[in-house]
């Protein structure tokens, strides 16, 4: 069993309220949290309206599968979330 922790930090240019932030970042938990091998939560910058940090914990039988899943998560977020990814960290436990 292999475990990866994927942390993404976002900038939300022009975002003026926490309500707007929820609308722009909304759905990350619903989109990825339903996958049995992925857990997701907003892990930082919770009180700032112009930034956000989300952490994904991915488990799998091989490191290769987990790396592939991390890449898929990043690509899907780039296509679907109205925010700019500022930093990506991958850690294997």
Which residues make up each language-model segment?
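Beta-strand elements of well-folded, non-transmembrane domains
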Residues: 10-14, 34, 60-62
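Short arginine-rich
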Residues: 27-36
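Hydrophobic residues positioned within well-ordered beta-strands of beta-sheet architectures
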Residues: 4-8, 54, 86-88
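A short linear hydrophobic-aromatic micro-motif
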Residues: 38-43, 86-87
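Short glycine-/aliphatic-rich beta-strand segments at the starts of folded cytosolic domains
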Residues: 4-13, 18
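C-terminal structural segments of small proteins and small subunits
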Residues: 58-93
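Short, charge-patterned binding micro-sites
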Residues: 3, 41-61
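C-terminal binding/interaction regions
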Residues: 21
